[in-house]
């Protein structure tokens, strides 16, 4: 039964204005446009009046927007037919958890109503439709009733065979094209030979499985190939040269090259998690460090948001599936694209070169892709702390002559770190008879052939196969799966997981064979046991689809009951689909058709397939130096500040949660002005320690257009000069991930790849003592297409991205680029590892003048690089550095500018001692760093530099001033003189333009104005209480511990740090899942307090916190239980972020909350992750006693934090009752509604509220993430261990005496 429910308006006024502007630009005669949500319900039976009312209440969410009459021509945008959106999965979950069992499935669309000035032609209709939907993910129908097609059910399809016994190799060649298998010629020979020997034809599913498992993407054939270069056989494969780094420096590596991620030694710390009895405790143990970096380039080119989202999701699964289960912790992302060509902001170096229609533009990729990557990390609950962004697209003379080099096929980088227990680093044994399980969501007909598709040059596959390889993200599902994995590894030796892999490229067709093969087993499987949301799928589609958020596991039969219980508690779907066998044979049975779609020996699938030989020739490049004739320094500087690789990247950073876990010690944003210039990301190893982990990135791809090896060396070296800013110690503690992107087969590129790998694996890394225990390759970085009968090609430069990871001794010693003006007399020093060469080839300067140059920067002296690292480590350890920033993209002038921006100060630099060529001195990208030291420490610093052989490379640069100036002189001659604030504005223009396109332009304008304001005072803190006083200490001393329910729903992700804050305040913190209350495993009557935690319950579907709250309100027993708890006079309750939204929705059952608002989408219409300044008001709130009059920063991470009242009298009522506990304030400590000081646009800056009795508080910011000083992005230097917000938790303990 199909039913339609009208929803609220879908687009705000500024979104409608943006859409109208696009129509106008496209010359479409649109007179008016209105859009509203439509909800479609697939019902097993008709709903009663009460059920209909409940469902309508569920489907009422979002901000109140102006409603219009639905008139004009209707176009309804729905999910692509044959797919199920992640919104649908979550909304359906909510309906079921609210008791609406007749709902089979919910889906959502947007109905657009247009009035036109004249009738549209068919071509105009097509253009109109292209502006309102994403063809890769959505379909347009002309009437709401036509959306019923979403729920059409078909009979299962059988497998097909390819007749090679009669048709021979030719039959396989046809299947290779039609199925998009990307099989090589020798692989086709191998398959024909082996199936002929078996005496049968292959089934389509078997061929598909073989193609995925043996694709370049999965098998890394080029990195394992034999090489002949210029007729000379090479001694080693690429992979052997990478492995050489481990052979030379195995120190501190616990696992390399054999698992989903590499593992190195970590620190012994108190890991905080809930035991099996539910109580949170510290566990003193080794927290070893795992690391992984992936790329997801092809899917991001085709459909940027889901491509980047599932890129991050897949890498997170790699971490969680390491060993016998691990914990992902912090992430990084990166993007390389062609020129942006932002309308109205076109730059002199940008030409609007063409692209094929099947791929997204660079601008679209950088609008949608980062949102996808951030959204997945946010919803999963992993802070994204590091990244890079490069644009390149230019016709240059390189190794293949003059041609266009660029990133039409983008790089989308996703990586991170995690932690793992010592006993779980290695996989276990898979016993015969072990249950083979898929953990996670159902199979869907999406993401088919991703492994093979990503191994092809863009443009070589059929366009319908590009559609098939688009994936769908559901991070909230992955979070549920991770919670199960966490419960498993937290059981220590009792961990029920024997073996685990993630499901990625190739789906189960790759994951399950890999699982049993790695365990030395075979497997018998039942196809119809696989959870499947689409009945009509064929065996190939069920087995080979790449539905995300899935893991495959082996669990011994005796441990199965424990595992199932954990899954049920976390509401994580799972299916037992097979058993491990002694014989290494793979059988897949299909109950529906009673046949075997797969019946193969494992040796055929994963055995000795033909080994590749690369017989290639090297080429030379012959270029001219950068022509400096018409380059004026000021203009050059302004251009470079606007180049994306240099420009401020706030638009890529504040969309990503950077505080979740409460263990982030250094994110991108630096200092009181929160400038995104940090060289390194740093986390604490646990919530009770200053030991930690660090990550950095190094990448210099354009250099490869001149010198392959130099580009690779610079990438490694830059990762070291970046990570040197924190307290690591021995360089052997640093481990690298190498991600290689190349257009294999393109003239000169193969030999260049070999040269680059050799430079890293055989030479530089062994010399430095560095190991590369993990990495990834993407060998098809080329886009070809035909345009007006002409063949076009855009080829990416060889691109090596190095990610460096290390254990940190003391996270507090990390040095930032923020120049200090409050430390007395100081000096600026340049340590020039380029030894004065100042080469300009392949620099930002060359790029902005459409040049390439001849000689690029390079590692001049390996020993000096090592000495530099050791010297910086000594100075970091001794606390001698006030500021540190490496020289990289843009050169010395950018290094100095970014340091001045971070310090909101002036610079007077003197460059006479650095050489004769101003452009070379200021814009060369040679290795090095600028440091700021106290005059009183100068002698000691020079002594350390002398000891490490660097004193002859150390140059005095000049002074830091308190003025709004940026001056560079050569003797008495002024080379450049500008206002720092004006340069700050130029540097911010890219972010401003991107935010105006993507977000609310009014918010973008407000933030841009704040950045340029020379009077901006930055953050400050003033506390009216003693930060070091533990007001709860006398009550903790009694030994009594009030019990607090740390409440979470599926998708909540901030519960562990919340438990830690209450544990420190003297509570017995208990992990309580909503499923515990539903099943009566727990009851709120047994608790003194409850806290509803932050995150993304149900992925914020049906309104943030709304689904969670309504699962209480629509369940009589739960509603009564919560109401009784709130009405008791001996209880406290706190709601933070998602918990704030949830508890505000429960206002009807909480005394004294009649004036509470609901929380709706931020004014920016963007997830906002920032440090924000708040002021505490006088109130009767138990939680905020003694804090009134204080102001201090706090972590903010939400997309729906704006208060919305039913009427003005509610707001006035809150004011009159004194229930507004805290407000966002500007840097002058005035309550504000101006963005971004007020990140969500709430009236009066409202951000925390109390009920009338003071026992219930709700707040959107996250005090639990900053209860330790070290986890604040900025804090006054006199704060010690406890942060300012620890007082809130201790106040709660005082209440219970």
UniProtKB/Swiss-Prot annotation:
Domain Glutamine amidotransferase type-1: 1044-1297
Region Disordered, residue ranges: 305-324
Active site (UniProt): 1137 (nucleophile), 1262, 1264
Residues reported in the UniProt entry to bind ATP: 307-318, 888
Protein location: Cytoplasm
Involved pathway(s): Purine metabolism; IMP biosynthesis via de novo pathway; 5-amino-1-(5-phospho-D-ribosyl)imidazole from N(2)-formyl-N(1)-(5-phospho-D-ribosyl)glycinamide: step 1/2
Binding site for Mg(2+): 679, 718, 722, 886
Leader peptide range in chain numbering: none
InterPro entries: Class_I_gatase-like, FGAR-AT_N, FGAR-AT_PurM_N-like, PurL_large, PurL_linker, PurM-like_C_dom, PurM-like_C_sf, PurM-like_N_sf
CDD domains named in the record: GATase1_FGAR_AT, PurL_repeat1, PurL_repeat2
Function, as annotated: Phosphoribosylformylglycinamidine synthase involved in the purines biosynthetic pathway. Catalyzes the ATP-dependent conversion of formylglycinamide ribonucleotide (FGAR) and glutamine to yield formylglycinamidine ribonucleotide (FGAM) and glutamate.
Protein name (Swiss-Prot/TrEMBL): Phosphoribosylformylglycinamidine synthase
Native source species: Mannheimia succiniciproducens (strain KCTC 0769BP / MBEL55E)
Lineage, top ranks: Bacteria, Pseudomonadati, Pseudomonadota, Gammaproteobacteria, Pasteurellales
Gene expressing this chain: purL
């Amino acid at each position: 039964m199909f039913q339609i429910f009208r929803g609220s308006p879908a687009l705000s006024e500024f979104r409608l204005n943006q859409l109208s502007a696009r129509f106008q630009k496209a010359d479409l005669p649109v007179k008016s446009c209105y859009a509203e949500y439509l909800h479609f319900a697939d019902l097993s039976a008709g709903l009663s009046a009460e059920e209909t009312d409940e469902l309508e209440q569920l489907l009422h969410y979002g901000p109140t927007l102006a409603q219009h009459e639905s008139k004009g021509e209707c176009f309804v945008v729905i999910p692509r037919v044959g797919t199920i959106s992640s919104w649908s999965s979550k909304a359906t979950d909510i309906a079921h958890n609210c008791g609406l069992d007749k709902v089979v499935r919910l889906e959502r669309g947007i109905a657009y109503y247009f009035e036109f000035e004249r009738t549209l032609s068919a071509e105009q209709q097509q253009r109109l439709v292209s502006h309102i939907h994403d063809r890769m993910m959505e379909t347009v129908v002309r009437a709401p009733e036509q959306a019923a097609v979403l729920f059409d059910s078909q009979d299962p399809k059988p497998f097909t065979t390819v007749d090679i016994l009669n048709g021979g190799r030719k039959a396989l060649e046809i299947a290779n094209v039609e199925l998009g298998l990307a099989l090589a010629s020798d692989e086709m020979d191998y398959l024909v030979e082996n199936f002929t020997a078996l005496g049968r034809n292959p089934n389509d599913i078997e061929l598909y499985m073989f193609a995925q498992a043996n694709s370049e993407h999965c098998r890394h054939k080029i990195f394992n190939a034999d090489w002949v270069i210029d007729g000379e056989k090479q001694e080693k494969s690429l992979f052997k040269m990478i492995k050489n780094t481990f052979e030379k420096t195995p120190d501190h590596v616990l696992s390399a090259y054999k698992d989903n991620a590499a593992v190195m030694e970590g620190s012994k710390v108190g890991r905080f998690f809930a035991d099996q009895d539910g109580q949170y405790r510290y566990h003193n143990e080794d927290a070893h460090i795992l690391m992984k970096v992936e790329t997801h380039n092809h899917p991001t080119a085709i459909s940027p948001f889901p491509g980047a989202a599932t890129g991050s999701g897949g890498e997170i699964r790699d971490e969680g599936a390491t060993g016998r289960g691990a914990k992902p912790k912090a992430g990084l992302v990166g993007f390389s694209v062609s020129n942006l060509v932002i309308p109205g902001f076109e730059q002199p170096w940008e030409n609007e070169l063409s692209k094929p229609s099947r791929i997204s533009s660079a601008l679209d990729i950088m609008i949608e892709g980062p949102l996808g990557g951030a959204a997945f990390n946010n919803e999963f609950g992993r802070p994204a702390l590091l990244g890079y962004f490069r644009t390149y697209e230019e016709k240059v003379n390189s190794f293949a002559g003059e041609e266009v080099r660029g990133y039409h096929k983008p790089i989308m980088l996703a990586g991170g770190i995690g932690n793992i227990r010592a006993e779980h680093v290695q996989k276990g044994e898979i016993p015969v008879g072990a249950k083979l399980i898929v953990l996670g969501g159902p199979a869907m007909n999406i993401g088919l052939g991703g492994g093979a598709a990503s191994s092809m040059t863009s443009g070589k596959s059929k366009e319908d196969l590009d559609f098939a390889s688009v994936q769908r993200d559901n991070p909230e599902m992955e979070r549920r799966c991770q919670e199960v994995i966490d419960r498993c590894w937290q059981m220590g030796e009792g961990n029920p997981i024997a073996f685990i892999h993630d499901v990625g490229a190739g789906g189960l067709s790759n994951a399950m064979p890999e699982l049993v093969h790695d365990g030395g087993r075979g497997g018998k499987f039942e196809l119809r046991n696989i959870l499947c949301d689409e009945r009509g799928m064929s065996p190939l589609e069920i087995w080979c689809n790449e539905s995300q958020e899935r893991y495959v596991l082996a669990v011994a039969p005796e441990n199965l009951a424990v595992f199932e219980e954990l899954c049920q508690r976390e509401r994580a779907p799972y299916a037992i689909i097979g058993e491990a066998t002694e014989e290494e044979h793979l059988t897949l049975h299909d109950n529906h058709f009673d046949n075997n779609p797969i019946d193969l020996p494992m040796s055929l699938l994963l055995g000795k397939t033909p080994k590749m030989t690369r017989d290639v020739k090297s080429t030379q490049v012959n270029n001219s130096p950068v022509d400096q004739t018409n380059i004026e320094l000021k203009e050059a500087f302004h251009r470079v500040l606007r180049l994306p690789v240099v420009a401020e990247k706030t638009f890529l950073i504040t969309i990503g949660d950077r505080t979740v876990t409460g263990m982030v010690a250094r994110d991108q944003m630096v200092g009181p002005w929160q400038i995104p210039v940090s060289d390194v990301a740093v986390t604490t190893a646990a919530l009770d320690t200053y030991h930690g982990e660090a990550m950095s990135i190094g990448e210099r791809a354009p250099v490869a257009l001149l010198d392959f090896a130099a580009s690779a060396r610079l990438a490694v070296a830059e990762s070291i000069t970046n990570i040197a800013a924190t307290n690591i110690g021995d360089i052997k503690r640093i481990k690298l991930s190498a991600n290689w992107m190349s257009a294999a087969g393109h003239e000169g590129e193969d030999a260049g790849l070999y040269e680059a790998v050799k430079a890293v694996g055989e030479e530089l890394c062994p010399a430095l003592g560095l190991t590369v225990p993990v990495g990834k390759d993407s060998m098809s970085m080329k886009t070809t297409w035909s345009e007006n009968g002409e063949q076009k090609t855009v080829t990416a430069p060889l691109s090596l991205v190095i990610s460096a990871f290390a254990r940190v001794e003391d996270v507090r010693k990390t040095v930032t680029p923020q120049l200090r003006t409050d430390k007395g007399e100081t000096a600026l020093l340049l340590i020039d590892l380029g030894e004065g060469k100042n080469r300009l080839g392949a620099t930002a300067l060359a790029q902005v003048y459409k040049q390439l140059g001849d000689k690029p920067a390079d590692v001049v002296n390996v020993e000096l690089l090592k000495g530099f690292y050791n010297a910086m480590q000594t100075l970091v350890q001794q606390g001698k550095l006030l500021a540190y920033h490496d020289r990289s993209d843009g050169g010395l002038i950018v290094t100095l500018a970014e340091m001045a921006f971070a310090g909101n100060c002036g610079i007077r630099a003197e460059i006479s001692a650095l050489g004769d060529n101003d452009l070379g001195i200021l814009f060369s990208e040679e290795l090095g760093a600028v440091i700021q030291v106290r005059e009183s420490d100068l002698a000691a610093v020079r002594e350390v530099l002398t000891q490490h052989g660097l004193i002859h490379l150390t140059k005095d640069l000049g002074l830091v001033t308190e003025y709004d100036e940026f001056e560079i002189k050569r003797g008495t001659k002024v080379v450049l003189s500008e206002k720092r604030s004006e340069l700050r504005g130029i540097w911010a223009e890219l972010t401003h333009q991107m935010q105006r396109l993507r977000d609310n332009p009014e918010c973008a304008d407000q933030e841009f104005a704040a950045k340029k304001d020379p009077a901006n005072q930055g953050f400050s803190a003033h506390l009216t209480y003693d930060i070091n006083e533990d007001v709860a200490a006398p009550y903790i001393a009694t030994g009594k511990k009030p019990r607090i329910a740390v409440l979470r729903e599926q998708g909540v992700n901030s519960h562990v740090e919340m438990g830690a804050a209450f544990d420190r305040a003297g509570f017995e913190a208990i992990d309580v899942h909503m499923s515990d209350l539903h099943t009566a495993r727990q009851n709120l009557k047994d608790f003194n307090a409850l806290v509803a935690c932050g995150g993304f319950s149900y992925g914020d579907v049906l309104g943030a916190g709304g689904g969670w709250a309504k699962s209480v309100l629509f369940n009589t027993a739960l509603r009564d239980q919560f109401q009784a708890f709130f009405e008791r006079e001996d209880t406290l309750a706190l709601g933070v972020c998602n918990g704030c939204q949830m508890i505000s929705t429960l206002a009807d059952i909480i005394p004294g909350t009649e004036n509470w608002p609901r929380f709706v989408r931020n004014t920016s219409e963007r997830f906002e992750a920032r440090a924000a300044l708040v002021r505490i008001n006088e109130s009767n709130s138990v939680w905020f006693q003694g804090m009134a009059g204080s102001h201090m920063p706090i972590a903010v991470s939400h997309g729906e934090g704006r208060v919305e009242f039913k009427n003005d009298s509610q707001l006035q009522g809150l004011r009159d009752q004194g229930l507004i506990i805290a407000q966002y304030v500007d840097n002058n400590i005035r309550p504000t509604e101006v963005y971004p000081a007020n990140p969500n646009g709430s009236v009066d800056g409202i951000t925390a509220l109390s009920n009338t009795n003071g026992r219930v508080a709700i707040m959107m910011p996250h005090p639990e993430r900053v209860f330790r000083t070290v986890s604040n992005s900025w804090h006054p230097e006199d704060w010690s261990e406890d942060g300012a917000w620890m007082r809130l938790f201790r106040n709660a303990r005082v209440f219970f005496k």
